[in-house]
Amino acid sequence: MLFQGQITFMHGNSIEIDSDNNLLLSNRTSDEIIKIDRITGEIIWIMGGPLNEFTFIDDPLNGFNKQHDVRRIENGNITLFDNGTGHSPMLSRAVEYQVDESAKTSRLIKSI
């Protein structure tokens, strides 16, 4: 993104070691959660944003944007704060997704 002569490629605002010992990185600028192999550095998958590999199910807003605080919780679901500045109308919310990494689906379980 270009703002007053500055290029903002990545705004990483959370990183977490996932249950399989890989990394979950939240990149706010591109609206993406990126799962990275902790050993090789290879991208395993991308959820959200322009390179999205997932289908969002039961989510009337079809995903998140400008997210913060991405976490994998004990039941295996992913929670995050959806800043929502790209939604119409703009709507911030806390969400929980049930993620099937094999099928590449992300089902909205809770939205507050």
Give the residues covered by each predicted segment.
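Histidine-/acidic-rich catalytic cores in large beta-rich domains
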Residues: M1-I112
